[in-house]
Amino acid sequence: MKEMVDYGIIGFLIFLSVIVIAIAIERLWFFATLRVDDYTDRRKLELALHKRLTLVATIGSNAPYIGLLGTVMGIMLTFMDLGSASGIDTKAIMTNLALALKATGMGLLVAIPAIVIYNLLVRKSEILVTKWDIFHHPVDTQSHEVYSKA
């Protein structure tokens, strides 16, 4: 059961962090190569910009709960060991509680960067939509030339 907490919960959290990093790299590459003048419809641009961002937000908001699940399982294991042992082994109790807290820590370690990445990507997409607005509804001709290269 300890392996389920260690490899199952923590392994799943590591997998989720890899997904967040992969999406962040893909989105940053997409944003860097995007030309706002390629889109004639703002709605299509917004759809393209927000692709996969919901997944990043979902991972960021749920990773602490997954870590908490690992903590609850680790504490349950500790109580099971206490109940089945004839004597009290403080070292075993502390080891099991440390394992339980490790799951919570991993959940936070995944969640905090995921939320930061999500916020940065949403802000960058808002900037690109604003550049699209400036390009398609210019107030002066100079702004049209500047933002057509974005």
Swiss-Prot record:
Species for this entry: Helicobacter pylori (strain J99 / ATCC 700824) (Campylobacter pylori J99)
UniProt family annotation: Belongs to the ExbB/TolQ family.
Biological process terms in GO annotation: protein import; transmembrane transport
Topology versus the membrane: Multi-pass membrane protein
Entries under NCBIfam families matching the protein: exbB2
Subcellular location: Cell inner membrane
Secretion signal span: none
InterPro entries: ExbB/TolQ_transport (IPR050790), MotA_ExbB_proton_chnl (IPR002898), TonB_ExbB_2 (IPR014172)
Transmembrane segments: 5-25, 63-83, 97-117
UniProt-recorded name of the protein: Putative biopolymer transport protein ExbB-like 2
Keywords of this entry: Cell inner membrane, Cell membrane, Membrane, Protein transport, Transmembrane, Transmembrane helix, Transport
GO CC field: plasma membrane
Paired cysteines (S-S): none
